[in-house]
Amino acid sequence: MTKFAFTAFIVAAVIGIRASGEDKPAPTDSGSDLLWKKVESRIDEIATRFDGVIGIAIVDLTDGQRSLLRNADHVFPAASSIKLAILLELYHQDEQARAGTKGKAALDDLYTFNPKDLVEDSRVMSGLSASVTRLTNRDLAQFMVAVSDNTAANVLIDRVGKDNVNGMLHGLGLTKTMLRRKMMDVAAARRGDENIASPQEMVQLLEAIYKGKILKTDSAKQWIKQLSTLKPSYIPRELPDGVQVANKPGELEGVRTDSGIVFSANRPFVISVMTAYASDGRAAEQAISDVAREAYHYFEMRGKTSEYGRILPTP
């Protein structure tokens, strides 16, 4: 073989090797799969230790590659988590009102406090001056979100309409989530008219709002901001200070629930944990907090690492 021919052979071989290497995709069996399996295992342990019934739904909002569903289609008492749907219908009607549709509730519509509207667990409304204090629907929504004021929630139910709330939910394909009564309606509760939801449908609702499938962008941002008001709740209890959580907890005898969007850095996720038949309310609250903590640790870590686990340099 001549020197020229040998050189040409080597060049061709090198080019072929490079081309072959460029055609091969990167391996997909990364450590993130193993990390997620560890999270699933720890959450399963939490669920097993809990003495009642627990339902869990977690979905990655970045690309949807990670999700965890445990008893997620089971129907639970929603408790005050149903107020998510009331808040959503209010914002939906506000969009309609601003577009000129008559008979829809707007966020800036006024309400004059009437003590006849008062029900139990109304921490703010019970201290207002009758026939003097005027509030907007936005104010009522803030009371409903921040301190779970039941009178504020009931006034908003009257204003947006229970049937409209359920119609909105049904239109989204959510058949297990229903507003069946006002807050503190003991007689209705005894009849079995419980406000209900499933973890999976609560997650679907929150995901649709986050992705702009229900409200327009500005309205969705306002809705999330209002729901992110700091309040006593279970999802953020063991998360680092400063993590934004747009959530609504709920509490009834034997029941604890919490559903929301957790804005972990670069990797937000949506979570709903619902419990029932709980002999120990504090244990139920702790179970929700423990599940949220495990989920957060995964998404927070994945938000700052490569697919293979290296913590990436900050910009």
Predicted segment positions?
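Structured C-terminal helix/loop/strand segments within mature extracytoplasmic catalytic/sensor domains
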Residues: D23-R49, R159-G161, Q204-Y234, P240, ...
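Extracytoplasmic
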Residues: R49-V53, N71-D73, P77-I82, A106-D108, ...
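Active-site SXXK
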Residues: G64, P77-Y111, I271
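Conserved catalytic neighborhood of penicillin-recognizing serine enzymes
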Residues: K116-N154, K162
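Bacterial N-terminal signal peptides
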Residues: A5-G16
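A short, well-structured edge-of-sheet supersecondary motif
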Residues: K38-N71
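Mid-domain, small-residue-enriched loop/turn segments at the edges of structured enzyme/sensor domains
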Residues: V53, T133, A153-L206, Y210-K211
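Acidic helix-start/capping segments at beta-turn-to-alpha-helix junctions
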Residues: L61-T62, K104-M125, V160-G161, Q226, ...
